Amino acid sequence: MAKKKGDQYDSDGAEDQDYDEEPVFEDPAGFVDDVGDDELLGDFLKQKPCESDGVENVIVVDNIPVVGPARFPKLQGVLEKIFKNAGTIVNIHYPKDDEENTKGFAFIEFKNPEMAEEAVKAFNNYRLDKSHTLLVNLFSDFQKYSDIPKDWSPPESQPYKVQNDLYTFLSEPDAQDQFCVVAESTPGAVQVQFWHNTQPEPVELLTRERFTETYVKWSPLGTYIVTFHKQGVVIWGGSSFTKINKFAHSNTQYVDFSPCEQYLVTYGPNGQKIIIWDIRTGTEKRSFVSDGSSNMSMFRWSHDDKYVARMGDNAIHVYETNTFYLLDKKSIKVQGIRNFSWSPTDNIIAYWMSEDIDAPARVTLLEIPKKIEVRNKNLFNVADCKIHWQKSGDYLCVKVDRYSKSKKDKKDADVKFLGMFYNFEIFHMREKDIPVDSVEVKETILAFAWEPVGSKFSIIHGEPSNANVSFYEAKKGQEPTMLRKMEKKVCSHLFWSPRGQFIVLANLQMGSFEFVDTNDFTIMKSGDHYRASEVEWDPTGRYVVTGTSGKVKEDHGYHLWSFQGRILKRVNLKNFMLFLWRPRPPTLLPDERQKEIRKNLKKYYAQFESKDRVRMTRASKELLEKRAKLREQFVEYRAKRVNDWEEQKYRRMQLRNNMDTDTLEADPDNVEEEIVEILVREDTTLLE
């Protein structure tokens, strides 16, 4: 046991323990160590020397053309141009015969093994020309496959492991949502609490101390929660959040799930690799070397997990997830590409390319896997573009920052744009030939947001201290029409309800919020949460949470609001870091069944109200019992303190010259009485 410094000596200054005796560090009898070296020393054991060191960063490229000395430089240039895309090449060796002709294969050495693995995945079966398809293998694989034993033995059957039910959170009888609260309990130790959002008081499900080292993140459908550790990340699930799988990637800074939760992407620190994992098996599907720049969400997924894409130099690299090879074994060349984004419901990529000397800027919609341009729009005098998909995939908005003129600064190479104005190009994705409408705004744009379910979109424009909020609607076959312009609003962010119709106008610097119903554009309620830095809607659109993170030195915690802006709960939590609602998967009910339920919703009201009354009655009874118990505890505590106070009376009188000062009447000669008159109000009554 560790001892405090002050406990090393007793009151006489003598040592209370003989420290000459050596401590015993042996394990107690019967101790079983269930933690292996791989888990404790994973990073260190990776550096253990092995026989393959020195050759694991070498690849063998077979089926290259056999050429003589005259054509050799051209072959050399072509292969170097291809394989330098996988990483830094250290050396290339071309074996030759007596006549200096190449033998049809070559050895390429890369800077590290990760680059060699990337070259194998990217360029194996690469079609060089009509007669030559490259076969690429790791040099170390030759030894591995040559050591396969001749006598085959069947694999041993493994005992069946009972799997956790990962979807118990969806079977809650009243469909109450879950949320987690993250707070730093001690420096370097993060506590995570899991709650059910029951009314009138939430019910705590579980509390995990030291659950993560930094923060947590839910998967898109709410099946898993991921935690971050020095050795890598771990995903948890089930009713008690048991460990599902772990992924060894040291110092992971960020993770990203695919939309259908089949794959997980872990991003290491700048300069390290990025890994795509299969969530269920825990196997590494593909790895990439970071270029050292900001790489958060560098990979973007199609809605069905069939494709993943990333942007390169004048190209989009689209990979098929069944093999993680490039689609059609080649990238999509796009000169001057600046950004791209997948449709949330279709395999369509929207990208924009900047202006060139002889060509305007351009927005293009590309259908995958056919690589057919289904729509494009030329744009002129473009400084920047932002791509905004509507959640249902019905509309696409491209915010275009345009300028009247530009000039180049003599001191630096930066271009300055003058006379800025803004266009919103609205693509109607469900209509024939995808018509495009344009909305022009002269004022500075502060924020833009689509209604997730519906056809409205909102814009904050003007000066931050005196902004306007405009609401538009994009109807089929019509140009977008302005529904309402709300003037002189001090807001900076827009947060739509996931069910549409309701929106929160937020100013995260001042902590002020306005709750608006966009059916008639009434402001239902306004509220404040000083220094709030985050806003989170629950999946049902019934509740909103605002929170103050650890960046604020005081008033940590979160507020729970109804969708109408009524404050329901204030929670102050020391070192509060994060509040996250648990996502829900899409409903399995078909559209026809949903419409039928909405049509007959009134007949369910009585049932819901009855449940609410029973719940509130039960909650009121529990609340009264809780208060009575707290009162009993207080009375008991007060009685103990009064008893202690009475026992200390003799000591108090000793300190006060044997004078009893417990009551004013004890020593009337030592009491001064002063009468103070205060004028509270003066009334004048006229008598007629």
UniProtKB/Swiss-Prot annotation:
UniProt feature, compositional bias: Acidic residues: 9-25
Residues covered by region (Disordered): 1-28
One Pfam short name: RRM_1
Location(s) in or outside the cell: Cytoplasm
Positions annotated as WD repeat: 208-246, 247-287, 291-329, 332-367, 440-482, 527-572
Gene3D superfamilies for the chain: 3.30.70.330, YVTN repeat-like/Quinoprotein amine dehydrogenase
Keyword annotations of the record: Coiled coil, Cytoplasm, Initiation factor, Protein biosynthesis, Repeat, RNA-binding, WD repeat
GO CC, one annotated term: eukaryotic translation initiation factor 3 complex
Main location group: cytoplasm
Domain RRM: 57-141
Keyword match RNA-binding: yes
Annotated GO biological process: formation of cytoplasmic translation initiation complex; regulation of translational initiation
Family per record: Belongs to the eIF-3 subunit B family.
HAMAP family from the UniProt entry: eIF3b
Physiological role: RNA-binding component of the eukaryotic translation initiation factor 3 (eIF-3) complex, which is involved in protein synthesis of a specialized repertoire of mRNAs and, together with other initiation factors, stimulates binding of mRNA and methionyl-tRNAi to the 40S ribosome. The eIF-3 complex specifically targets and initiates translation of a subset of mRNAs involved in cell proliferation.
Subunit structure: Component of the eukaryotic translation initiation factor 3 (eIF-3) complex.
Identification of the protein by name: Eukaryotic translation initiation factor 3 subunit B
Native species: Culex quinquefasciatus
